[in-house]
Amino acid sequence: MKLSAWHKAQGDSVEWYEPLFSGHMDKVYMSKVFSFTPDYEYFVNADEVIKGGSGYCIELVNGKEVYHKERDAGLPYEVEHIYPDYSIYYGKVKDIENTAYGRLTLGCPRGCAFCHTGVKDGLRSHKVADLSEFWIGQKNIVLLDQNILACKDWKPLLQQLIDSGAYVDFNGGLDARLVTEEKAEMLGKIRIKTIHFAYDRYEDKKTIEPKFRTIKELTGWGRSKVQVYVLVNHTSTPRQDLERIYFLRSLDFSPYVMIYDKDHTKQGSFVRHLQRWCNNRFLFWSIDNFDDYEPWRKSAEYRKIESEVNQ
C-alpha cells in the first residue's frame, strides 16, 4: 500500500500484476512473510522484478530458521512514512474502506529463539510513527506492532488510540509479562475489537499467569475479544501445552495454537490434532477435554503419549 502510494505520487500507474492481462510492466514487486510460502514460479513480463519481505530472508539450517538481515532491504524512509494507498485492496479485503493498517512501534527486547523480530527490527521497541501517519478517521484500526508495551512511549501511543474512538485490533501478540495495572486500565479504555497476547514459553508460567489474571480483573474481557497465541513444538511438552491452554480457557480467553516448524510435523501428530481442536472455536468451546476430541483419541499418537500427558 505504501509502495503504491509512493509510485502514484510520482505519476506512475499502479495495478495488481495479472500475467494474462497486464502485459509488459516496467517494475513488479513481489513479497512474502513466511519462508514456506511457495515462490511465484511463472515468467514475469517486466523490466525489473523486486522481491522483498521476511519470507525471502529466512533459511532453514539444521532444522532451525535463520534470518539473514543483509537480504532485507526494507523501504526507503520516504516510502515507509507515506500515507498508505488503501484503494488497491478495495474489493479484495473485507471492509478495507473503513479500516486503517499500520504500526506505531518496531522491535522487541526479548530476543526469543523462535522469533526473528529482534534480528530484523532490533532488540528494542521504539516508536516509528504517530497514528495520524496511517489513520484519518476510519472506524477500524488494525495494529501490526510486535511489542508496543515495551516501548518507552507506550503511554502517549495508547492515548492516541483511546482518543481516536476507533475500534482497534491489536493483531500482533502483546507481551502480557509487561502488563501493569496502569497499562491494563489504559487498554481497557480503548475500543477493542480484538486483542492478541502471547503465552509462548511454559517457563514464564509464574510471571505471565498473574498478568493474565490482572487483565481479566481490570478489563472484564472474554473470549470474544481476547485471543492468546500459544507456541507448541518448540521446547514445551504436551502436558505443558495443555496446561497453558486450559489455564487460558479458565479465564474465558481463546487460545490459538501456533506450531513451530509445522512443515516438519506429521499429519497425525499431537500438535496437529491440538491445533485443529483448539483453533476451531466451535470444537474448543464444546469439547472441554482434549482427550475427548475423537480424532485425537482414535489416533496412534494418542496411545504413545497418553501416559506423559496425564502423569
Regions found by a protein language model. Name each.
Residues 49-90:
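Ser/Thr/Gly-rich flexible loops in soluble cytosolic domains mediating phosphotransfer, phosphorylation
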Residues 189, 194-196, 203-311:
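A structural motif corresponding to the C-terminal lobe/cap of the Radical SAM core domain
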